[in-house]
Every structure is written in structure tokens, then in C-alpha cells.
Amino acid sequence: MLNKIKNNIFLKSTLVLLIGGVIGKLVGFVLRIIVTRKLGAEGMGLYSLLAPTSSLLSVIATLSYPTALSKIISEKSSRTKTLFTSIIPLSIIINIFIIGITILLAPTLSTLLKNETLYFPIICLSLVTPFISISSIIKGYFWGKQNMFPYMLSNFIEQITRLILITLFINKFLSISLTHAISFIILVNAAGEVVSQLVMMYFFPKNIRPSINDFNKNDIKKVMDICVPSTSSKIIGSISYFLEPIVLTNVLMYVGYSKDFIVYEYGVINAYAMSLLLMPQFFTQNMATSLVPELSKYYSLGNNEMCKKRIKQIVLISCSIGGLSTLIITLFPTFFLNILYHTTLGLDYIRLLSPFTILFYIEYPLINALQALGKSKSAMKCTIISSIVRLISIASLSLLKIGMYSLILSIIINLLLSTYLYTKEIKKVLSN
């Protein structure tokens, strides 16, 4: 068994990611508990309202670089040196535009969210994106080489950095205001990304030093050919997620709910219910990451049977992890909420969501599988359909005056639909 693992790069990469993921997630989870306890339901509500904007900016900034670069590097279709020399300048230009546009739109966005206090935190989100972008480019190299240790170690040290900074200074910013504390937490992410980059660069081959002479337009085209359809799918999903709190807040206020109620309950759902139910989701995300280069390689060789085998393995493991964790949390929700967050808020939301939570765990591997199979356009089509349905369901269900249950029900509808669509597309691709 040990010899089999040693000789199987996919298994080694997955195991390294899982072990490193557990360690990194434990630190990240401690950090999340500290932040949640410090900010409270109201603070987490405000922080959660910013999460969709953060997700959208990150998707645009990273442009699916890890997936694209890992695919190109694993197929050995370009020189690594020219890849980095070509992509980094493009990334810098894109991030300058992101910062400028975000600063211009921040007042409008904070007004749409019915919370003008979010103006400065929104600007802080844009200032973090360049650091996230550069990190994603470096990660793409190690993913393509299926060398997951540098990525794992950098992720762990990044979390430790964030934990130390937030533990030391969060109270000082809270004494000023919730807005200052939230802005500080956002900016700490930039410090974590810088530390992560330094760790990964230590493991980077010394012979790869980007030079202006290595700039290659063809490399940009190769990366963009993968990034554009792949990112288009993610951007559509992120735009839907971005519009979620705007649509939800405005429709619920229209039918009579107060702004304070919406912020508070939105915080309860995201900070307590969803956070608890999705605790082990990093397992499936890490496995899906290691799946991309492996699946790309077999698909390029025309080995559909091996592709099916790998996808089935990941989905089976994901279902096992998701099913077991959901069962335990569903049986003892009060215990976990009390011990982790010192609250019992979110119990009803957990009970309603738990039967469908397993779909969260298999959704990410299915999306990555489609992208690895070169079917980013199919993934985009599925995302467009499910995103439109989600927004329509949020708006229409909110009109029924059922409070935040309109959001819960729309999440369930979206999960069922998107899982069905992704599965259908994968079967179609591999049946040819």
C-alpha cells in the first residue's frame, strides 16, 4: 500500500493536501471562532454582506490562474519562465483597474447594501486583490508540478500570521468601531498573502527568474484560452453571489423587514449555520485541486476510463466526508454552537439545510472536473442557469414574507439544480 502511494503522484498530492489542509484549517477555524466571537452577530452580519463583493473581486483578480497554469505546466506545453514573465504584468494591470473601479463604485455599493458604513471596508477589499492575484500565480506552478508541500506550508504560515495579527490588535480596532475592526480584518489578509508568497518563493526553482526578454504573447493567449471561459463561469457565479445580499436586503425591506433584522439574521446564517455545516469542506476543495492536473493529463491521452475513475473516487470521498460531518452536526447542533461560538443562534437554519449539505461537498469537485476536461463553457452555462434561478427564487420567496427562510430555500434550490447540471455535463463529455 505504501509503495503504491509513493509511486502515485495523484495520491501523494491528495494526501499532502489533506494533511496540510487539516492543519491549516484548524488554525483558520480557531481564527474564525475568534473573529466571530469578537464581532458578534451584528458584526458578522456586516462582514457577511461584504463576502460576495470580496468573492467577485478575488475571482476577477485571480482569473483562474491556478487552474490554467497547472493545466499548461502539467501538459508541458510552455516554458515556465516565459509563462510567469508574461502573466505577472497582465495581473498587475488588471488589479490597478480593479482598485480604481472599486473606489469609484464604493459609495453606490454601500448605498445598495443599505449600509453606508461599509464604504471603507469595500475599498479595503480592493487593496487586498493584488496580493491574492500574485499568490494564485505562484500556486499554479506548484499545482501543475503536483508538488503540494510548498502550497500547504505557505497556507499554514499564512493562517498563523493572520491569527497572530488579529489576536494582538482586534480589540484596539473594536474600541474605535465595528467598521474599523472589519477593515482591519480585511487588510490582515494582505499581510497573510505576502508571507505566503515569501514561503512559496523559497521553494521556487532558482533558475526561473522572469526577465522582460522572456515576454511571450502566445503564453498569454494559452492562459487566457483557459482562463476566460473558466473565469466567466466563476464571475457569473460571483455576480449572482454579489447580487444576493443586494436583492435580499432591498426586497425584504420592501415587504416590511428592518435593516437591523436583515443584517443580524444574515450574520447568523453565514457565521453560525453555514460555517458549522461546511466545516470540513476544505477536504473536498483540496482534493478537487489535486484532481485538475491529473484529470487534464488522462483526458489529453484519451483515457476516459481513468477520468471516470478519478472523478468517482473524489465524489465518493467527498460524499463520505460531507455525509458523516453533517450527520454529527445535525445530531448535536446545540453542543457545537455552544462550544464554538457561545450561542444557539441558527439552530432552525441548520436543521433545514442539513439534508442538502452533502451537495455542497461534491459541487466543487464537479466544477473542477469540467474545467480539467476542457469544458469551461459547459460549466459556465450551468452556472448561468443556476445563478439566474437562485436570484429569481430569492426575490420571489422574499415577497412571501417568510424572512430569511427565502435565502435558505433558494440555497437548497440552487444546490439541487447546479449538482444535476454539472453531473449531466460530465456524463455527456465522458460518454463520447
Where are these regions (language model features)?
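N-terminal membrane topogenesis motif
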Residues: 1-27, 85, 217-237, 241, ...
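Signature of the first transmembrane helix
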Residues: 9-66, 96-99, 103, 229-251, ...
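Helix-terminus/linker motif at the lipid-water interface of multi-pass membrane proteins
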Residues: 26-43, 110-111, 173, 235, ...
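Helix-loop junctions and terminal segments of transmembrane helices
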Residues: 62-77, 274-302
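Short membrane-interface helical motifs at transmembrane helix boundaries
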Residues: 97-116, 324-343
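Alpha-helical transmembrane segments of multi-pass membrane proteins
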Residues: 100, 115-137, 165, 187, ...
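Membrane-interface junctions at transmembrane-helix termini in multi-pass inner-membrane proteins
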Residues: 131-154, 355-385
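Membrane-interface helix-loop junctions in multi-pass transport and translocation proteins
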Residues: 146-150, 160-197, 374-377, 387-419
